[in-house]
Amino acid sequence: VRGNRIRSRPVDSADRGDGLRLWYSSGNRIENNDIAQIRDVTVTNSPRNRFTGNTIRDSRRAFNFLFAHRSLVDRNHLEQNSTGIIALNSDGLIIRNNRILHAMDASGAGIALKETSAALVIGNEIVHCAHGIMADSPMNPLNRIVFIDNFVAHNITGVYFYGAKGGHIAIGNTFRSNLWPVTIIGDGDPLDDTWTGNYWDGYEGFDQDQDGFGDRPYDLLAYADRIWLETPAARFFRNSPVLELLDFLERLAPFSAPSLILRDTAPRMKPTRTYN
């Protein structure tokens, strides 16, 4: 399917038709299409596909994958959709070099992975979304989800991991101007996730040996934020003056030990990439 212009009816996104639907087929190539004002591009029980160079905007879910194993999503422009890419039970995905903008639906995300293992998310620009990246933990901890060299900026939450901690590797990503860079909710040890070589705009360390990496690890800690992390009903008050004041007091003179969200063992001093 190459070089098509696809539109749906001018109604609410849930009432529109799918711009493209694939099921029980394999080896499909969807290239350089202009798609807008649809419901979803839905791919079900269809492995080994290539989605390259497409533009999808003003829709509900740009790509909706279900059992679409070993598919490639490359160089697509996804803008003003409720969610950019959502994948359920789709192992072995490669999501690379996509630009995902303005997915600001309350429950939306730039990229959302659920019950998906052995995925590689590399070189994407994810800007101004409710959640930049959402993912649970892979079923098998050996089949990790890997995030490399992504630009994650101006999102409400940069990365949101839920479920049992572990099974994620994040290397060389840039996190800038997110309201909250990373949120991880679930049981387990936060050190079971691997973070290294990422740029954090909140890092306050030094680089005395001038190797481009901070001299000490970057620890993201939750102080008063634990209130809304552990009590979903309190998220409405996130960043309210009262919680901001409580967070300031907790950092100044902690009433209790803060919770470790993540530790980046070698934070970068400069971003690996910028937004073009």
Residue ranges: model-predicted function:
Residues 1-63:
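Right-handed parallel beta-helix
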Residues 13-23, 36-39, 58-64, 80-86, ...:
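Extracellular beta-strand/beta-solenoid scaffold signature
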Residues 104-106, 110, 119, 132-138, ...:
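Functionally critical loop-and-helix segments that line ligand-binding/catalytic clefts
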Residues 12, 41, 49, 71, ...:
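Surface-exposed, flexible loop/turn segments at secondary-structure boundaries
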Residues 20-31, 47-50, 69-72, 91-96, ...:
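Surface-exposed loop/turn motifs in large extracellular/passenger domains
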